[in-house]
């Protein structure tokens, strides 16, 4: 829900803003607006939004559930891109373990293109996440350079948990040891890794392809 709106009258007129009822509206100078907007090209309006808090108890389990485990991912832009892809590919929940980045970083929110506010995100310790997944019979697939199988050679069984690791180190030893199946994306021309958000999109859409078309 939107709690407050800040706007710069030199960029946008108040009458052009669709303001929700009971929302505090504050006019600010161009100087102040530039300080709080974090970028030069904006629409002239900034909202303070209260985000829902989620816990693992609120994750409803069904036979088409996909959960992402983001294990120590550091770059805000990558997390934001993953949130966007997750919304597009029907991911239910994102669990963050080994936290290295504040999910409220402006670059996370900006690069998610609104998906930040639509995605269930929870923080868990590794052991807590594993216990939850095992209890609810998730099949745990980990994206790993050490995998023997490629993502195309796997028939994905729901409910699914997909683990993606940090940009520099990949998944942690914990998830290397506790995943059910490790998968990788084949690459040519001496390239040994892809951006984590790209890897996430590739594997998620293969799961969607199998689920929707049975191919």
Describe each model-derived feature in a short phrase.
Residues 10-11, 30-33, 99-101, 167-169, ...:
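Short, acidic/turn-prone active-site loops that include or flank metal/cofactor-
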Residues 38-40, 44-64:
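Acidic/glycine-rich phosphate/pyrophosphate-binding loops and surrounding catalytic core
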Residues 13, 31-36, 127-131, 148-150, ...:
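A short acidic, often aromatic-flanked loop/helix-cap motif at beta-alpha or helix-coil junctions
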Residues 1-37, 139:
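N-terminal positively charged helical leader segments and presequences
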Residues 45, 111-115, 157-160:
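Short, hinge-like loop/turn segments at secondary-structure boundaries
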Residues 4-8, 26, 58-147:
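RNA substrate-binding interface of SAM-dependent RNA methyltransferases
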Residues 85-89, 103-116, 173-215:
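Structured adenosyl-cofactor binding patch, chiefly the S-adenosyl-L-methionine
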Residues 141-191:
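Active-site/ligand-binding-proximal alpha/beta "capping" segment
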């Amino acid at each position: 829900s939107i709690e407050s709106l800040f706007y710069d009258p030199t960029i946008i007129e108040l009458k052009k803003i669709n303001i929700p009822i009971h929302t505090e509206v504050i006019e600010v100078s161009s100087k102040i607006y530039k300080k709080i907007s974090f970028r030069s090209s904006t629409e002239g309006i900034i909202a303070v939004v209260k985000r829902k808090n989620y816990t693992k108890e609120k994750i409803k389990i069904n036979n088409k559930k996909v959960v992402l485990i983001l294990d120590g991912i550091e770059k805000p832009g990558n997390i934001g891109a993953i949130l966007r892809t997750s919304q597009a590919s029907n991911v239910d929940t994102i669990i963050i373990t080994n936290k290295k980045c504040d999910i409220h970083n402006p670059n996370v929110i900006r690069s998610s293109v609104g998906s930040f506010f639509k995605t269930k995100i929870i923080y868990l310790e590794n052991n807590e996440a594993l216990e939850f997944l095992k209890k609810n019979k998730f099949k745990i697939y980990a994206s790993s350079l050490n995998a023997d199988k490629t993502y195309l050679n796997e028939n994905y069984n729901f409910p699914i948990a997909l683990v993606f690791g940090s940009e520099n180190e990949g998944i942690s030893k914990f998830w290397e040891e506790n995943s059910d199946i490790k998968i990788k994306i084949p690459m040519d021309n001496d390239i040994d890794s892809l951006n984590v958000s790209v890897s996430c999109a590739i594997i998620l859409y293969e799961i969607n392809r199998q689920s929707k078309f049975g191919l």
